């Protein structure tokens, strides 16, 4: 039987605030166990939480960026369950009245536009961490307790694993552009649970869904969804029924396995958080946050095409990440050459980032220095070939391109008499090639250029070399 996959995603986005959601403890990653804690984190009697204003700001901005309705009045709620790494015995979250609802995200899959509706975006706190790899015992690290999260819940509008991955990548791009999260899936800043069901094609009624967890990359999201859909199809084709449960994705065995029976909302016994006042928003607050939103990729891409006259492909690559787009614009301010700047950022800069596995914020060559390098090429001070060598030195030096060129004697030679002398030597040393050129094998022009550049150690101005060589060959 032919089945249709129906997918809804629940994404937990860890916010990059300096302090936790309901207390002043640091959210710094990697601190020694149980050092970023306080009586509020540890649920000591008599402690009271206070909502971090930055968390509310991040929630509203993400809601605005995803076309949500922002609630004028919303409340926090207690989500009750027992787990060793949850000292309170409940998690502060939102239930009936979330801060954001009824939004949507638009994205492309293989060039085709798609739109996925959002049920809600709500604020909640993270639980602690259980550590199982120290001897035979289990230990608890409460550092993560209270770290702020936003949960983004989609409608079951997604119809393929590839579409789910594209949706997730778009959401990641949005939170990174907003600056509310680093969106790092491998480190758990963006955690995705997929609710997956299948139904016969053409049928409206939804099938029984399973929730799949433990997917820490876009590729694992795709593979887990594909596997789970195939597993459910095999169960139904064999005459069985799909069990509503939570399953864990095993990236080593490339399969899902049962984790626990799927909980329902009533299992958590939600009720309003009595220790926190309701969240009230107004038009002036929303207007303020709306004005602080960044220029998002689609608009920035269109502006790059019109303002800088660069190809659509270039603009698309440069605007995937906000920091890359910023870097490009800062470079153009110095170089005053958008296309050359685009070529360098898309080529040598992105290549180096990939090779060194670093983010642009850690890239050692600042836009100012790259812009200066491009300017030196434009002025004819150095050739593109020499510029590549200068760029490599800039990666491990704080010197300016001009300083490197002067120190290493890399300035381009444009002196016509010096170049004429070398070209004469090349032609004199290549009688056979010269005769073949005269006979019509004009592709040997490149050979003469190469020999000239080799003798001048790449310092000759290519434009001047071409002009003089053309003149000499025509009169030979």
From Swiss-Prot:
Xref: Gene3D superfamilies: 1.10.10.410, GatB domain, N-terminal subdomain
Assigned EC number: 6.3.5.-
A Pfam family this chain is assigned to: GatB_N
Superkingdom per UniProt: Bacteria
Reactions mediated catalytically: L-glutamyl-tRNA(Gln) + L-glutamine + ATP + H2O = L-glutaminyl-tRNA(Gln) + L-glutamate + ADP + phosphate + H(+); L-aspartyl-tRNA(Asn) + L-glutamine + ATP + H2O = L-asparaginyl-tRNA(Asn) + L-glutamate + ADP + phosphate + 2 H(+)
Any one GO molecular-function label of the UniProt entry: ATP binding
Coiled coil start-end: none
SUPFAM superfamilies: GatB/YqeY motif (SSF89095), Glutamine synthetase/guanido kinase (SSF55931)
Keyword Protein biosynthesis annotated: yes
Enzyme class: ligase
BP-aspect Gene Ontology terms: glutaminyl-tRNAGln biosynthesis via transamidation; translation
Entry function: Allows the formation of correctly charged Asn-tRNA(Asn) or Gln-tRNA(Gln) through the transamidation of misacylated Asp-tRNA(Asn) or Glu-tRNA(Gln) in organisms which lack either or both of asparaginyl-tRNA or glutaminyl-tRNA synthetases. The reaction takes place in the presence of glutamine and ATP through an activated phospho-Asp-tRNA(Asn) or phospho-Glu-tRNA(Gln).
Assembly and interaction partners: Heterotrimer of A, B and C subunits.
Family in the record: Belongs to the GatB/GatE family. GatB subfamily.
Name the UniProt record assigns to this protein: Aspartyl/glutamyl-tRNA(Asn/Gln) amidotransferase subunit B
Organism: Chloroherpeton thalassium (strain ATCC 35110 / GB-78)
């Amino acid at each position: 039987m032919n089945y249709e996959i129906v997918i809804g995603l629940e994404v937990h986005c860890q916010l990059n605030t300096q302090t936790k959601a309901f207390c002043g403890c640091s959210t710094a990653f990697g601190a020694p166990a149980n050092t970023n804690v306080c009586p509020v984190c540890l649920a000591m009697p008599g402690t009271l939480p206070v909502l971090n204003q930055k968390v509310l700001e991040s929630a509203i901005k993400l809601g605005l960026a995803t076309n949500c309705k922002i609630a004028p009045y919303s409340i926090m709620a207690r989500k009750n369950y027992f787990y060793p790494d949850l000292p309170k015995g409940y998690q502060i979250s939102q239930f009936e009245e979330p801060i954001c609802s009824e939004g949507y995200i638009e994205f492309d899959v293989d060039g085709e536009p798609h739109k996925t509706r959002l049920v809600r975006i709500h604020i909640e706190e993270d639980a602690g961490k259980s550590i199982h790899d120290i001897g035979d015992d289990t230990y608890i690290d409460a550092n993560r307790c209270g770290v702020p999260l936003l949960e983004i819940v989609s409608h079951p509008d997604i119809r393929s694993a590839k579409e789910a991955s594209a949706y997730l990548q778009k959401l990641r791009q949005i939170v990174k552009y907003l600056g509310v999260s680093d969106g790092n899936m491998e480190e758990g800043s963006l955690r995705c649970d997929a609710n997956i069901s299948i139904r016969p094609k053409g049928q409206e009624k939804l099938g029984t869904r399973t929730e799949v967890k433990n997917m820490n990359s876009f590729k694992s999201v795709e593979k887990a969804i594909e596997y789970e859909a195939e597993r459910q199809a095999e169960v139904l084709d064999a005459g069985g029924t799909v069990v509503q449960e939570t399953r864990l994705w095993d990236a080593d065995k490339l399969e899902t396995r049962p984790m626990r029976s799927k909980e329902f909302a009533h299992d958590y016994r939600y009720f309003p958080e009595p220790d926190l006042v309701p969240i009230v928003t107004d038009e002036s607050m929303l207007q303020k946050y709306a004005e602080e939103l960044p220029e998002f990729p689609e608009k920035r891409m269109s502006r790059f095409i019109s303002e800088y006259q660069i190809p659509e492909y270039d603009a698309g690559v440069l605007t995937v990440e906000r920091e890359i787009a910023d870097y490009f614009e800062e470079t153009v301010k110095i170089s005053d050459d958008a296309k050359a700047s685009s070529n360098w950022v898309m080529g040598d800069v992105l290549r180096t980032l990939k090779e060194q596995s670093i983010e642009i914020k850690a890239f050692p060559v600042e836009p100012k220095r790259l812009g200066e390098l491009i300017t030196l090429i434009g002025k004819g001070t150095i050739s593109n070939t020499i510029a590549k060598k200068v760029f490599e030195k800039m990666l491990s030096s704080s010197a300016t391109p001009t300083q490197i060129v002067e120190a290493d004697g890399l300035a381009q030679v444009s002196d016509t008499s010096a170049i004429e002398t070398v070209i004469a030597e090349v032609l004199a040393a290549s009688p056979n090639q010269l005769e073949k050129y005269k006979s019509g094998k004009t592709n040997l022009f490149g050979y003469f250029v190469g020999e000239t550049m080799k003798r001048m150690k790449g310092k000759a101005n290519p434009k001047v070399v071409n002009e003089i060589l053309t003149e000499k060959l025509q009169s030979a």
